[in-house]
């Protein structure tokens, strides 16, 4: 079989202007980037206001493993098959961060014959949205440092006299706004800034990866440019010496940050291998932020297509949960059905059983033990009131005996249906049965529900999410978290939803607890207000906001060939 890159290069692409017109966009609503990409102007939202919406399908997965479950492959494959069946369909996915592209995970365009193309353009830069987020974020960091420098240099009276601005009295130890870069670089996690006689004052800071920026979450959750401006103004960048929040609006930098992101608020239109439209927009990580593509892209797609297929990051305890309790809660966009991706490899890896057997080899004992993880994720999706279709992403090494056993086992669960998917090797033909079953699932009456109401106490939200969302026995708040809980409630933020920042490698907070852990207590060490994004992040366990590169990073395989073409992506 050809490599992902070879398949992408041999694809026969429609001119993006033609594809956009067929999708329902007007010429003036597309800002073309060559023949393969186009920004979609938000004036289309005004034109389509009041249009009936299509069916929204959310793709999720079992607990992720290093072997890859194929969630994006399934998202794109399902989209291609729905199109092949004669439906008007659109995929909505996140823009890949270059950190994972050059790290371990690789690209995020799908794979095989279920790809968004050209895949190298999607995985590297696209139309520059992540760079815009980085620049806007770092302007905020520079504005804080500059304001602190001038206030301390001049003192309150002279600063206000010379600048005409209010004295903010920023506490150097209260600056919470790091800088960002779109790479994995562990040595930047903790740094000293402001060193040198005329560069201070010095204070401890650090870098996060751009996908972890609250600006990225804001981009993904905003309804339009005006909403994004309001949200950016609410960003808490620092604390003053009285412990009060200093916002981007108070610092006077929110307008400029928004201006940098004025084009980033527009989704990018590309296409799948069989010419289905795909909107790529925003890229928040699911272990740190809410892990879903943008509300704007979904809103546009739902008014132009019969079916919209999107995905949440990692397993159903991560991106799917946050899709429901954060994205759907804020946007009002309600899914009609869910697709839960699994593989034989994933279930064996999630079995918790030690084995010398190669993960590709038949191992009925590990498969049966790992099935509990799949069943847990099925029940997790069902508790949100959605019909869930299990998609078994087939690998070449899979045996018919194990696949048949798994299909039969799923029939005894709460899943609406179960189908094999061979979209990776067969493209649109490989997910036809899956598409037909998903269509039937979307015809079921909607019973979508959230896990907790807005008016629930903040501590009760944390407990509910731990117990119902992860199967924990309860939570344990650190002394710091208890104090922050009281402060957030007193300041009137208890109505916000909770975003758990935890490992994706286990349903629990501990990556070593495989399968379906029980009886564990979730340790909440810190609560962080994300006033602009509109949620409170609970830091659980040891979650890094700046990844590091591994021993053999992905960049080792990436180069340019003699024809000037990029090689090694995928």
Swiss-Prot record:
Report the pathway entry. Answer: One-carbon metabolism; tetrahydrofolate interconversion
Q: Which GO terms describe its molecular function?
A: ATP binding; formate-tetrahydrofolate ligase activity
Q: Which UniProt keywords apply?
A: ATP-binding, Ligase, Nucleotide-binding, One-carbon metabolism
| Catalyses which reaction(s) | (6S)-5,6,7,8-tetrahydrofolate + formate + ATP = (6R)-10-formyltetrahydrofolate + ADP + phosphate
Q: Which residues bind ATP?
A: 65-72
Superkingdom to which the source organism belongs: Bacteria
Q: Which Gene3D superfamilies match?
A: Domain 2, N(10)-formyltetrahydrofolate synthetase, Formyltetrahydrofolate synthetase, domain 3, P-loop containing nucleotide triphosphate hydrolases
Q: What is its EC number?
A: 6.3.4.3
User: What InterPro entries would the database entry show?
Assistant: Formate_THF_ligase, Formate_THF_ligase_CS, P-loop_NTPase
Q: Which GO terms describe its biological process?
A: tetrahydrofolate interconversion
Q: NCBIfam families of this UniProt entry?
A: PRK13505.1, PRK13506.1
Which HAMAP family does the record match to this protein? FTHFS (MF_01543)
- Family stated for the protein in its record: Belongs to the formate--tetrahydrofolate ligase family.
Question: What is the protein's given name?
Answer: Formate--tetrahydrofolate ligase
Source organism per entry reads Shewanella oneidensis (strain ATCC 700550 / JCM 31522 / CIP 106686 / LMG 19005 / NCIMB 14063 / MR-1)
Organism lineage: Bacteria, Pseudomonadati, Pseudomonadota, Gammaproteobacteria, Alteromonadales
Q: Which gene encodes it?
A: fhs
